[in-house]
C-alpha cells in the first residue's frame, strides 16, 4: 500500500471511497437523515470538497493496486476559514446539493467555525477508509503520513471526531480531547481534538 498526495485523476475513486466511508457518520446522518438522499448527495459533497483541496493544503490517498482504499483531507494553517468571497461564490452550488437540508448543514458548519482554534495548525477535515478495509491500518498509515510533516514543521494538528468510538484511535496518534460540541437543534456531539507536535510542550489551545 502506498500513501501519496491526492491527484485530480484520483477524484472519482476517492469520492466513491469517502462516500462509502461516511455513509453512517453521525454528522452526515444528521444532515441527510434519509438514507437514499444521503447516498445520492454524499458523492457531490465530497467531489466539491476535493476539487478545492490542492490549493488549500492537500489531501492524501492510500492506494493499493490502483484502488483508493482511503483518504485524508487536510487544510493548511489558516486555510480552514474560507474567505467571504469564496463562500458567496460557492453558495448557489451548496444550496443545490443540500436542498432542504441546507439549514441543518449551515447550523453544523457555523457551530464548528465558532469553536475552531485560531492558533496556526493543520486541520484534518476528514479521514475515511473504505468499509471493507477498516481496521487494517489504512487510517493509521494515512494519519501518520501527515503527522510526520506536522512534527517536522513544529505545527499542531486539529480535528473533530463525530464518533466517540474513534477517540481512542486518535489518542494513540497523540491527539487529546480539548472539548465537546453538541450541534444545536438536536444534532450529534463531536469531540474536539488537538495534537501538539511530538516532543513539543503541551500548550493551551487558543479558541
Predicted regions and their residues:
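A short beta-loop-alpha structural element at the N-terminal edge
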Residues: 2-16, 20, 24
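Conserved GNAT-fold acetyl-CoA-binding loop/helix
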Residues: 25-47
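A short helix-loop-beta-strand connector motif used in the catalytic cores of GNAT acetyltransferases and
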Residues: 41-61, 117-123
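Conserved acyl-donor/pantetheine-binding loop and adjacent beta-alpha core of acyl/acetyltransferases
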Residues: 68, 73-128, 134, 184-188
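Conserved GNAT acetyl-CoA-binding A-motif
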Residues: 120-122, 149-162
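Conserved acetyl-CoA-binding loop-helix of GNAT-fold acetyltransferases
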Residues: 129, 135-148, 172
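C-terminal "cap" of GNAT-fold acetyltransferases
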Residues: 155, 159-164, 183-207
Amino acid at each position: 500500500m502506498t500513501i501519496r498526495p491526492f491527484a485530480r485523476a484520483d477524484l472519482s475513486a476517492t469520492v466513491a471511497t469517502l462516500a462509502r466511508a461516511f455513509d453512517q457518520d453521525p454528522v452526515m446522518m444528521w444532515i441527510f437523515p434519509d438514507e437514499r438522499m444521503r447516498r445520492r448527495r454524499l458523492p457531490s459533497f465530497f467531489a466539491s470538497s476535493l476539487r478545492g483541496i490542492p490549493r488549500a493544503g492537500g489531501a492524501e490517498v492510500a492506494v493499493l493496486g490502483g484502488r483508493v482504499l482511503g483518504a485524508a483531507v487536510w487544510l493548511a494553517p489558516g486555510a480552514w476559514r474560507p474567505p467571504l468571497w469564496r463562500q458567496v461564490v460557492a453558495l448557489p452550488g451548496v444550496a443545490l446539493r443540500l436542498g432542504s437540508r441546507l439549514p441543518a448543514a449551515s447550523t453544523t458548519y457555523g457551530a464548528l467555525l465558532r469553536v475552531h482554534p485560531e492558533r496556526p495548525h493543520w486541520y484534518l477535515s476528514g479521514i475515511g477508509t473504505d468499509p471493507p478495509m477498516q481496521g487494517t491500518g489504512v487510517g493509521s498509515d494515512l494519519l501518520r503520513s501527515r503527522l510526520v510533516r506536522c512534527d517536522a514543521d513544529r505545527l499542531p494538528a486539529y480535528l473533530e471526531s463525530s464518533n466517540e468510538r474513534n477517540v481512542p484511535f486518535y489518542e494513540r496518534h497523540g491527539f487529546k480531547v480539548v472539548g465537546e460540541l453538541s450541534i444545536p437543534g438536536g444534532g450529534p456531539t463531536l469531540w474536539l481534538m488537538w495534537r501538539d507536535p511530538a516532543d513539543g510542550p503541551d500548550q493551551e489551545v487558543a479558541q
